[in-house]
Amino acid sequence: MQVLPPSSTGGPSRLFIMRPVATTLLMVAILLAGIIGYQALPVSALPEVDYPTIQVVTLYPGASPDVMTSAVTAPLERQFGQMSGLKQMSSQSSGGASVITLQFQLTLPLDVAEQEVQAAINAATNLLPSDLPNPPVYSKVNPADPPIMTLAVTSTAMPMTQVEDMVETRVAQKISQISGVGLVTLSGGQRPAVRVKLNAQAIAALGLTSETVRTAITGANVNSAKGSLDGPSRAVTLSANDQMQSAEEYRQLIIAYQNGAPIRLGDVATVEQGAENSWLGAWANKEQAIVMNVQRQPGANIISTADSIRQMLPQLTESLPKSVKVTVLSDRTTNIRASVDDTQFELMMAIALVVMIIYLFLRNIPATIIPGVAVPLSLIGTFAVMVFLDFSINNLTLMALTIATGFVVDDAIVVIENISRYIEKGEKPLAAALKGAGEIGFTIISLTFSLIAVLIPLLFMGDIVGRLFREFAITLAVAILISAVVSLTLTPMMCARMLSQESLRKQNRFSRASEKMFERIIAAYGQGLAKVLNHPWLTLSVALSTLLLSVLLWVFIPKGFFPVQDNGIIQGTLQAPQSSSFANMAQRQRQVADVILQDPAVQSLTSFVGVDGTNPSLNSARLQINLKPLDERDDRVQKVIARLQTAVDKVPGVDLFLQPTQDLTIDTQVSRTQYQFTLQATSLDALSTWVPQLMEKLQQLPQLSDVSSDWQDKGLVAYVNVDRDSASRLGISMADVDNALYNAFGQRLISTIYTQANQYRVVLEHNTENTPGLAALDTIRLTSSDGGVVPLSSIAKIEQRFAPLSINHLDQFPVTTISFNVPDNYSLGDAVQAIMDTEKTLNLPVDITTQFQGSTLAFQSALGSTVWLIVAAVVAMYIVLGILYESFIHPITILSTLPTAGVGALLALLIAGSELDVIAIIGIILLIGIVKKNAIMMIDFALAAEREQGMSPRDAIYQACLLRFRPILMTTLAALLGALPLMLSTGVGAELRRPLGIGMVGGLIVSQVLTLFTTPVIYLLFDRLALWTKSRFARHEEEA
């Protein structure tokens, strides 16, 4: 067994000890680079790990979900399905709207995905309906990603149509141009239009049809090229009064003549300025408004984007009339900044606690100043590297630096403690620094690279979780590496200049009392260690028991994915009976809004009713509830949600589903609850059979709550069953029937009014105020081949049926999504297992496939790779330690400390009521790196004592344990206090930080107590094993 010998001449530290000016200037350069880097780093909630996502929206007013699916969604899906790099394609086809969400592989640049989407849309153009009002529009945005900012525009003096027109032309377009903005949506549906409401009885009495009126309007309002005249000396451009701009002009339009008398549009219709879609509405609190939601592009920095919007807003609002009020209702960056500020405060607190524990142990101001300089220098220097790596200041990188506080101080402590030992023995400070730094240099290198080795597996984690923690791992590794450099350069140089026998021996009353206390603790530890060494097998059984206990705890501890954060914003979905109309839904929504706004934690509320890119049907409404800042309300978001749901339960005929918005968004669709599970089949019939059965089972599970499905197949349909023979005999085609129905009930966009600033539509429909419901179909008239007027009822029968309100696809096949939450007394792991067990009992046919989606799918993936991740971390550390020690045995001795860390972390999580989520798992992996430091410091000195002083293994490890007890205790407490602010955090984003702190504090406490006794015992056992192995080999060689 060979060990690399430590240098007695200062090793790599010698040059820096002997050149203090150069060392000081080098450290100043690192400090300045870090400060400049800190100022240049962007701020965000989490690392940018979004999947490249593009949403394609196609609007076809009046089309049923079935028509939207077959005529619009399917042709587009076929083209999109051929794109390379596509990870998942989901679509939702509802009345008048098709929304397709395309999620690409993480490695595909968003700009490349955009080019492929545009090419696919172009290829599908010829397959789409010819009367589609507008071509498909794509946006580089994830629809499930909550808006970064929500603004409400209201006015007490102007109609909403004029307000929306101004907002669209003067505000929304400018905000859309800001870098990082992916989509600006205006909810409220008050876009100006000229609405033509036909009087069915009037046109029937005159022998006219709606098609006659439509043809007259489209022919009277045109905007096309007319050419120019080019004479010998002058050129003249041709123009004409071919455009009609106002409702009054349309009223005067002559649509036909009877007996030589003109029939004007105003004679048979009500023509008025109105909204393009009367089945859309938005409210801010209790006031009707135009709600502007700003969503970012995937990968864009949310803070800089929001800052740019706020800088532009005053300029934009100045262009609006004074009666128009623009209010910022929600800004996600407010909570993000608060969370980052809290994490920065916890970082400073960790530094202060670490410096305090150093002084408590060293009891010497100069000796305390040295690590007090090394710690912030290592952390600040990390910022410079983060800039070059395109990182950001976010919760995870700041958590990495907070944890690094306990790590980076370890190196400085080890160096100072070793140099101080030689100074106290009477050596000169310079000689002691050279000798102490040279002796400890190999230990520092071992500690550093073995700790970085633990982080290596995090860099190779796949999918979005790996991307998420890459910044965390690299930031921590860089801080540790800079710390090692500082500890081998600045720290010994400062020790040589600042420490002396007089300063170290200078004691006050506190120093003397604490020194006596430490001496008593070391003496007690020595007595206990001697007893333990005399009973090695009992100690070994304790070590094996911790290994078994850690495995049992791992199996039984509740498991989750990502902590649920309180960001102060709640997303809500309001569900009413499937036959609800727009007016009915708007009334129910206002009732619910009144209840919600009475809650003391609610600051504001926006709501939307109607069908658009995020809301699939008229019987549902979207809500965004903005809570007061955390310090202004008594309860956190989960309690507020429970209270709101209880209050809304008293409103009859509606179901409310609420979930808090999260910084990490993996889903690609707006969901009712936090977690999703999908059923996919080859036909809608198969889904209609099995979805109700599965829903019934899942709603009975105690592990699930708020179980709901987007399967809605009880929408009322008036099925027009045309007698094709009769229609053909009269010369009426099915196209004529469809056109007549579309003209009457589809809010048909029949013409466009062009202005210098915008384009507006002419909307055709029947006035159904006097003939509500199915009776309106009796007023439909068609033109026969001989010019006569034929009632629809003479060639068709009307049947009332049920049909889906929306048709959803996943990768081109019908799918339904089951959403659910997890009750407080269960974990996501419990819920996932319960769903899988239930699925098995149903014996689903082979043509139905099930899959978890979004964060639930990511949880499954992360859970499956967690064990391998920890194994990889242990293997990586073993390889590094084996190379450093040139031994197969000593790395095993060092790694034997790991089960104690696992037991402590898991027990702490159980006691605190926290789940084992990905944050806690990262803490356990870091514990692997921290805990083994104790063993490294013991074994390094034991091997040196055996080699240089000829001690027996037992005496060597005994002396090493006593000699290194103080620095071991100091470094462990430093790491513990570095994690303590995270464990005790209560501010914004505390849910994210607390599991890491809990796991690390618990693991450090238990491992500190156990490893001080188990490590020396295992060292001796492996030493005996090595001797026995050598003797066996020697005997075999002699016999040979």
UniProtKB/Swiss-Prot annotation:
Name of the protein? Multidrug resistance protein MdtB
Q: Which residues cross the membrane?
A: 25-45, 347-367, 369-389, 396-416, 440-460, 472-492, 537-557, 863-883, 888-908, 911-931, 968-988, 998-1018
- Biological source species: Escherichia coli O127:H6 (strain E2348/69 / EPEC)
How is this protein induced? Answer: The mdtABC operon is transcriptionally activated by BaeR.
Keyword set for this entry?
A: Cell inner membrane, Cell membrane, Membrane, Transmembrane, Transmembrane helix, Transport
Q: Which domain of life is it from?
A: Bacteria
Location, primary (coarse class): membrane
What PANTHER family does UniProt report for this protein, alphabetically? MULTIDRUG RESISTANCE PROTEIN MDTB, PTHR32063
Membrane topology, from the record = Multi-pass membrane protein
The UniProt subunit note reads as follows:
Part of a tripartite efflux system composed of MdtA, MdtB and MdtC. MdtB forms a heteromultimer with MdtC.
Function description = The MdtABC tripartite complex confers resistance against novobiocin and deoxycholate.
A GO molecular function annotation here is: xenobiotic transmembrane transporter activity
Q: Which family does it belong to?
A: Belongs to the resistance-nodulation-cell division (RND) (TC 2.A.6) family. MdtB subfamily.
Query: Cellular location of this protein?
Result: Cell inner membrane
**A cellular component annotation (GO) from this entry:** plasma membrane
> Could you confirm whether the keyword Cell inner membrane appears in this record?
yes
